[in-house]
């Protein structure tokens, strides 16, 4: 994407001075003349949202709209609707705002106002309904002759979602929207469309995506109003997110720190803290990652809560003997609209399930990969296949073949593909695993590198090479206090014992499994298939009392769920 303005000079400036400061308020709003009596209410609702009181803020806006006289300005309703979506997005009330926004759209008289409210409603919609709502908004903006409105609606249409549109079509629509935005010379419209197009390019793994996120983040001046600041923060956040996904951790960390400094309110500060936590986890600084994740979770549940929960779940798996997987289950509800984070959470949860010796630990992964393939996404799902390759190489081999055309070619994507190829090749994968480990070490992603070195040791051509690789893995895990991974290598029976080997970390001593014992796994597998206690006893040649005791212990380890619910939870493909 060519630069809209001479950006080279700004790129040379110190990070803190990159964004210009605008004296114009409500740069992003379609409401041009808001009534004087409404302005203090909008300021109060915004302040409540910035403090994290998003539900009361939304309630205030709904009550204010209901009290407007029938002849109130269209702009008043537009301003209320725009702010309602922003404060709802800061919390978890977007779905609650849907009926309100639809009602507002029926109360305005001009096509421009209807277009603005439908555009706002479309941005808050689900994947299935959004295209139709945005098409209605586009029609209204065309009736009004509003080029700016048409531009941002096309920009929103190009954003990747599970709606059946092809990736190439999205890029075409996004470029058209950006071209219209440039015609308006409106910085918010340009930033909005540039960011949505960069998001589309990211999911298609286009090499220019990272550069285009930088352009989108830098073009918009900082602004004191919430609606404009939302896109400024969103572009900065997605720039960091994309750099993280590419394995460019130095850039991701820097962009997240800059974003946190300029964040408009606690919600965005927490989201940037969550990105920092992800970077720290990947780069092996588990203590810092846990601290950043806890900071990101301080406040009302929202997307940052889920992102940080992924990190805390991953750190707990390394540091605790029997980590509670509930934090990952809870996190999924807060990140359902971000596929990149949703797939990462599923990958980490599958790793937990493997460590807990659950039946069918990969049960969520095939459906997630099918969704990615249906969306033609080439970014963010590769960790699902890496987890699969460690646990079920044959299944991973099938995925590797079926999704070959969608495999990401960014630096981390290439490293993951090499790792998967090495794991599925078995004894022939030694050299490929070593190459993958070196690529991960260079990112740096030391814990992933250590696991691949341990895997390479298992297929080494001779015992001496295998032990050398195990010791390299031990060094990485010990340096980064990755207790469970370290214990796994130390318990490897093929490891040559020596006086210089460290002891099994205290958190992993006397802990043979993170969850189920071997017998409990056998019982749980049969329970998942609907076997009764008597049938389990007959199948395993144990007494019915012993079978019932095992079922009871398994239920306790899954939070005390009833046996019928346990079977549903563990069912393969559930």
Residue ranges and their predicted role:
Residues 41-44, 418, 519-522, 526:
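Solvent-exposed, amphipathic alpha-helical segments
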Residues 36-40, 132, 172, 235, ...:
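Alpha-helix N-cap/N′ positions at the starts of helices
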Residues 502-552, 556-558, 564-574:
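Helix-turn-helix DNA-binding segment
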Residues 71, 212-215, 239-513, 531, ...:
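Helix-coil-helix junctions within alpha-helical repeat/solenoid scaffolds
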Residues 11, 18-279, 289, 308:
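Internal alpha-solenoid helical repeat scaffolds
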Residues 63-67, 103, 334, 367, ...:
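Amphipathic alpha-helical regulatory segments at dimerization interfaces
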């Amino acid at each position: 994407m060519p630069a809209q303005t001479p950006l080279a000079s700004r790129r040379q400036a110190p990070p803190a001075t990159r964004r210009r400061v605008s004296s114009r308020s409500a740069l992003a709003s379609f409401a041009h003349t808001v009534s004087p009596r409404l302005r203090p209410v909008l300021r109060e609702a915004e302040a409540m949202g910035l403090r994290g009181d998003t539900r009361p803020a939304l309630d205030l806006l709904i009550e204010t709209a209901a009290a407007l006289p029938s002849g109130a300005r269209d702009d008043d309703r537009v301003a209320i609707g725009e702010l309602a979506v922003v404060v709802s997005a800061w919390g978890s009330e977007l779905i609650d705002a849907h009926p309100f926004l639809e009602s507002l759209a029926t109360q305005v008289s001009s096509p421009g106002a209807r277009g603005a409210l439908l555009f706002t409603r479309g941005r808050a919609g689900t994947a299935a309904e959004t295209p139709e709502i945005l098409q209605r908004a586009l029609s209204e903006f065309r009736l009004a002759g509003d080029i700016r409105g048409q531009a941002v609606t096309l920009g929103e249409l190009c954003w990747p979602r599970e709606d059946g549109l092809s990736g190439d079509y999205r890029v075409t629509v996004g470029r058209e929207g950006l071209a219209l935005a440039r015609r308006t010379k409106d910085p918010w419209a340009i930033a909005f469309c540039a960011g949505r197009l960069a998001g589309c390019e990211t999911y298609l793994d286009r090499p220019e995506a990272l550069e285009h996120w930088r352009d989108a983040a830098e073009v918009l001046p900082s602004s004191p109003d919430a609606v404009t600041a939302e896109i400024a923060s969103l572009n900065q956040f997605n720039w960091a997110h994309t750099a993280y996904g590419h394995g460019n951790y130095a850039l991701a960390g820097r962009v997240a720190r800059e974003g946190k400094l300029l964040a408009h309110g606690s919600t965005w500060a927490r989201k940037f803290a969550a990105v920092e936590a992800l970077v720290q986890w990947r780069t092996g600084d588990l203590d810092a990652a846990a601290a950043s994740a806890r900071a990101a979770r301080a406040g009302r549940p929202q997307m940052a809560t889920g992102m940080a929960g992924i990190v805390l779940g991953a750190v707990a798996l390394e540091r605790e003997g029997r980590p509670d997987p509930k934090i990952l289950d809870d996190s999924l509800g807060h990140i359902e609209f971000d596929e990149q984070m949703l797939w990462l959470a599923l990958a980490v949860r599958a790793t937990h399930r493997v460590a807990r010796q659950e039946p069918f630990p990969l049960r969520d992964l095939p459906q997630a990969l099918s969704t990615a393939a249906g969306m033609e996404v080439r970014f963010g799902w590769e960790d699902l296949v890496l987890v699969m390759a460690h646990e079920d190489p044959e299944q991973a081999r099938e995925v590797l073949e079926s999704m070959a055309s969608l495999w990401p070619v960014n630096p981390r994507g290439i490293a993951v593909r090499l790792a998967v190829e090495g794991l599925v090749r078995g004894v022939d994968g030694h050299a490929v695993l070593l190459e993958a480990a070196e690529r991960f070490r260079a990112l740096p992603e030391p814990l992933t590198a250590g696991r691949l070195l341990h895997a390479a040791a298992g297929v080494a051509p001779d015992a001496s090479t295998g032990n050398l690789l195990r010791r390299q893995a031990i060094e990485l895990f010990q340096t980064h206090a990755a207790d469970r991974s370290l214990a796994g290598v130390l318990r490897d029976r093929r490891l040559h014992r020596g006086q210089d080997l460290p002891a099994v970390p205290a958190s992993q001593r006397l802990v043979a499994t993170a969850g189920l014992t071997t017998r409990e796994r056998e019982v749980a597998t049969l329970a998942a298939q609907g076997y009764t206690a008597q049938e389990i006893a007959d199948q395993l040649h144990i007494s019915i009392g012993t079978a019932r005791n095992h079922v009871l212990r398994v239920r306790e380890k899954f939070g005390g769920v009833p046996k019928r619910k346990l079977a549903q939870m563990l069912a393969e493909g559930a």
